[in-house]
Amino acid sequence: MPHLPLASFRPPLRGLRPTRCFPRSHSLSTQSEPHGSPISRRNREAKQKRLREKQAALETGIAAKGKPPAESTKAWTPKEIVLYEIPTEHGEKKDVSRPLPPAYSPRYVEAAWYPWWVREGFFKPEYQTRLPQATGETFSMCIPPPNVTGSLHIGHALTVAIQDALVRWHRMRGDRVLWVPGSDHAGIATQAVVEKKLWKERGLRRRELSREDFLREVWKWKEEKGGEICQQLRVLGASLDWDRECFTMDAGSSVAVTEAFVRLYKAGLLYRSRQLVNWSCALRSAISDIEVESRPLSGRTELRLPGCPTPVSFGLLVSVAFPVDGEPDAEVVVGTTRPETLPGDVAVAVHPDDARYTHLHGRQLHHPLTGQLLPLITDCAVQPHLGTGAVKVTPAHSPADAELGARHGLSPLSVIAEDGTMTSLCGDWLQGLHRFVAREKIVSALRERGLFRGLQNHPMVLPICSRSGDVVEYLLKSQWFVRCQEMGEQAAKAVVSGALELSPSFHQKNWQHWFSHIGDWCVSRQLWWGHRIPAYLVVEERAKGNTEDCWVVGRTEAEAREVAAELTGRPGAELTLERDPDVLDTWFSSALFPFSALGWPQETPDLARFYPLSLLETGSDLLLFWVGRMVMLGTQLTGQLPFSKVLLHSMVRDRQGRKMSKSLGNVLDPRDIINGVELQVLQEKLRDGNLDPAELAIAAAAQKKDFPHGIPECGTDALRFTLCSHGVLGGDLHLSVSEVLSFRHFCNKIWNALRFILNALGEKFIPQPLEELCPTSPMDAWILSCLARTAQECERGFLTRELALVTHALHHFWLHNLCDVYLEAVKPVLSHSPRPPGPPQVLFSCADVGLRLLAPLMPFLAEELWQRLPLRPGNTTAPSICVAPYPSAHSLEHWHQPELERRFSRVQEAVQALRALRATYQLTKARPRVLLQTSEPGEQGLFEAFLGPLSTLGHCGAVGFLPPGAAAPSSWAQASLSDTAQVYMELQGLVDPQTHLPRLAARRQKLQKQLDSLLARTPSEGEAESQSQQRLSSLQLELSKLDKAASHLRQLMDASPSPGEL
C-alpha cells in the first residue's frame, strides 16, 4: 500500500459499530501537576508541611481568600465510540486480524483482553516460571483489601494503578510474581451501611431483627458489593491471581483470627480490662482511632447530631465556680467545653507552683451541682498558663483525667451511658436525658445557683465518629486489649536497623513517634458483623460473687471448657459457658492478611514460597493503623517481618485540595472516568446512596458545579497513566478530570502513530532481530538513542518505584521524540521509491520496544497494538505483551549516544526558531528559503548532517549556509539561536508588508496593554513572585519579537520597487 498521510489513512472497517459518545459535552480544566523530577528529602518534608497547613485551612474554611483552581467551562467535544463487536467467546483471544479503527476508542481497545489474560493463566506465578526470561526470583504482594461497604473510589484506583504497574514490570522481567486479591469485611463500616439501608428501605432498626437475620442481610450486601468490587478491579486491569482470592470473613481467615487470638492470649499479650475507650453512642460500640475524625472548630459552631432534634453548639468555653469550703467568698473558677460531664467531676487540679492557689493546697471545694466536697489537688500535668490554671478532673470521661486520677487514687464516676444518656449517678433530674440536652439543663442550673461565670468562644478539636457522625465519648468499659509496648519496640527497632524500609523515608519520624507512645489496643467491638471473640464467661464463677469475671479463651467451646475446668477445679461438663457476644476490631483480622491470605496457620506451599511479602504498597494514611499492626502481629505470630519494604503513596484529593467525601459530592467512581457519565446519572447515584437530605443537597450542588457537563470518557489506560504520573510519594495528589482527558489524547497519539507505522511497514515486512539493527542515518541513530535512554529512565523509575519518572520518560519519547519529530522527519524518506530499508526497521523497533516499555502502565492499549505487529523470524514472540520481556537498559545501551542527542537538540532549536518566524509572519503555506550562519567550529557540519529533517520539520525550502562574518541578507527575517548562531528566512515575495504591518501593530497594542496591567497590579496573596516575573519576561520578549518583525517588514517595504520603477 502506498504511503498516505497519517490523517488521511482510513482502512475499511468490519466488525465495528460506531456510536455517538455520551455525555455530549464536558468541562475541561487547565490544571496539571508537574511530575517526574525527584526532590531532596528536606524540600519534600517542607512541602509536606506546607501542604498539611494548606489542607487544614481548606477544611476549616479559613482559606477563603485563595481561589481553588476551577474546571474550565469549555465543553468537551464528544468523541465517536467504536465498539468491538466481533463474536468472541469469553476468555478467547481477541480478533486482531481486522484493521485498526481510525481513532482511539477506549471501549474497543479494552474489550476481551482481560478474560483472555485470566484464562491463559498469565497472572499466576506457576506460568511465569516457564518464561524464557525467567529470573528465578520471587516478587509477592497483597492488595490492601478494600472494604465491602460499596464500590471502589479513586483512591483505590491509585493503589491499583501503582501496584499493577510494579507487578506487571516484575512479571515481564521474568520474576515469579504473586499478587493476592481480597476484600475486607469492614465490621463497623459495613454494619452501619446495612443498618442505614434497612431503615431507608424497610423502616427497620437492627435490634428489631435477630442477630442471625441481620447477619443474613449483611451477607447479601457482601455478595452484591464484593462481586462489584472484583469487577471494578478487572476493569482497572489489575493482574491479580483470582484463584487465590480471599475475604477476611471466609473460613480460612476465621481459623487464622481465632488462632492468633488464642496465641496472643497464651503469650500474655491479650487481656480483658475496664478502661477508657473511644465510644460511639449512636453505634453503641467501641471504635478504633482511625474511625475518629478530628474536626477543628475556630469557635461557636452548630452541628446536627444523631438523636438530637435541634443543632448542638460546640466551640464554647463555660466558666464554672467551685466554692471553697469554709470560705464563703472564696472560689476556684474552671473552664470546660463539656459541662455535661460536671456530674462526674471528682476533684479540681492546679499546678503545685501556681502562686494563685498555693494558699488553697489541701483544701476542699464544693461541687457546683451537688455540693459534695471535692479535693483540690496539685499535679505538674496542669498547665497554669491556660485559662484560670485550674481544671476539673473527670476520670471516667477523659483520657488525660484518667491518668491524673490514677496518680491520685481518685475513683471514677461514669455519668454517660452507652446510648449517650445520663446515668443514675447524675440524680433524678438528669437521669435518662440525652447528654447534650442535659448540657443545657446543667448550664441553666449553674446560672440559678449563681455559679455560672461566663461563656466565650473557644477554638477546639471535636472528635467525631466517621461512621455515625456522632460526637465520640470516652467511656469506661470492660474490653479486650492487646499489649503493644513490647511488640511496638520491636517494630521501631526494625526500621532503625534497616530490616524494614519505609519509603518515602520521612514517614520514619511518625513511625518512631507512634511506637514510642503506643498504648494498648482495644480490639473488641459491640457489633454483630465480624469475627466473634473466642472467649467464654464462666457463669458459675460470677454467681459466686467474685469481683472479677472469669473468662477463658479457646479455639472451640470444648477447648475453652477444658481450660475452665482446669482453672476452677470443677468438671467441665458442670460448667456453664457464655461466649462473648462482641466481635473483634476489623484491623485485627486485617493485620493478619499478609500471612492468613497465604494459608497461615497451616504450613502451606504458598506460605513457604511467598512469605514474607516482597513489598507492601498502600496509602500513607494507613501507615500506623494497618501497616504498624501488621508488623507487630506478623513478627509476633510468624517470627518474621511480614514484608521488608513499605511503599506509601499520597492521598487523592479533589482539584480544590479537599479530601474525597461522599457528603461533599466529590467522590469519583473510577468507572465514571473510564466510561464517561452524564451529570444526571451522577446526581441519580447520589440520590440512590445513604446520604441524609442535608448532605444530599450539599453534595448535589457541589457535583453540579464541578461537573456541569458530566465526565468525559477517558478509558482505563489514561486513568492509570494519570495516577502514576504524579509524584505520589510526596505531596497529596490533586486530581483533575481534564488531566485524565489529556492523557486520553496521548493514547490517541500513540494509536495514530501505530497506524502510521503499520501502514509504513506494509504486509511483506520482516523484522530484523533487535540485536542486529544498526541505524543507517543520523536521524535513525537519534531516535534509537532516545529509545535506549527511555529504557534507562524507565528501568531507573521502576527500580526506585518512582513511577512518575517512568510516565514522564514514556510521554516524552512517544509524544516529543517519536510523534513530533521522527515520524514527521521520516515521511519524505518513506515516500521515496524504492523505500530505504533502514527507517521501517527502526519504526518497527520503536513500536515493539516502546509498547513493551508502556505495557505495565497502559496494558490494554499496549496489548491491542503490540498484537498487530509483524512477528520476528522464528516466531518466538510471547503470546501476550503481559509476559513479553521488558526491554532492559543493558540490551539497548549500544544505541545510546548522548552526544548525538545533544547535537540534535541544536537542530531542534533551529526548527523552533524557524517555526516561530513562520508564525510571526503568518507563512502558513509558503516554504521560504533559509540560511544558517554559525561561527562555532564544527557546528556547520552538525547542521549539514540533518539538513533534510531541518527542512522538513521547519517547513522551509532550500537550506543554505552563510559564511561566518558575512553580512546578513537584506530584508530577510532573522532569529538568534545563540551568540554564535543565527537563522535567516527569506520574506521577499512571500509577505505583503502593507497588509501585515497593521496586524503586527494591533497585536503589539494588545500585548502592551497586558504588560501595563501586569506592571500596575499587586500580585495576589499566595501568587509566586517567580510566576509573575515569568509572565512579565514572556510579554517583554514577545513585544521585542514583534518590534523586530515590524522593522524587517519596513525594510522589505523600502527595498521593494515603486510602481513607476516596474
From Swiss-Prot:
It holds the Pfam family Anticodon_1. ATP binds at K662. GO terms for biological process: valyl-tRNA aminoacylation. A motif ('KMSKS' region) lies at residues 659-663. GO terms for cellular component: cytosol; mitochondrion. Residues 42-56 have a biased composition (Basic and acidic residues). It is found in: Mitochondrion. The keyword Ligase applies. Gene3D superfamilies: HUPs (3.40.50.620), Isoleucyl-tRNA Synthetase, Domain 1 (1.10.730.10), Valyl/Leucyl/Isoleucyl-tRNA synthetase, editing domain (3.90.740.10). Its main location: mitochondrion. Residues 1-73 are annotated as: Disordered. Residues 1-15 form a transit peptide. Its EC number is 6.1.1.9. A motif ('HIGH' region) lies at residues 146-156. It catalyses: tRNA(Val) + L-valine + ATP = L-valyl-tRNA(Val) + AMP + diphosphate. CDD domains: Anticodon_Ia_Val, ValRS_core. The keyword Aminoacyl-tRNA synthetase applies. It is an enzyme of class 6 (ligase). Keywords: Aminoacyl-tRNA synthetase, ATP-binding, Ligase, Mitochondrion, Nucleotide-binding, Protein biosynthesis, Transit peptide. One of its GO terms (molecular function) is aminoacyl-tRNA deacylase activity. InterPro entries: aa-tRNA-synth_I_CS (IPR001412), aa-tRNA-synth_Ia (IPR002300), Anticodon_Ia_Val (IPR033705), M/V/L/I-tRNA-synth_anticd-bd (IPR013155), Rossmann-like_a/b/a_fold (IPR014729), tRNAsynth_Ia_anticodon-bd (IPR009080), Val/Leu/Ile-tRNA-synth_edit (IPR009008), Valyl-tRNA_ligase (IPR002303). Catalyzes the attachment of valine to tRNA(Val) in a two-step reaction: valine is first activated by ATP to form Val-AMP and then transferred to the acceptor end of tRNA(Val). Belongs to the class-I aminoacyl-tRNA synthetase family. This is Valine--tRNA ligase, mitochondrial. The gene is VARS2.
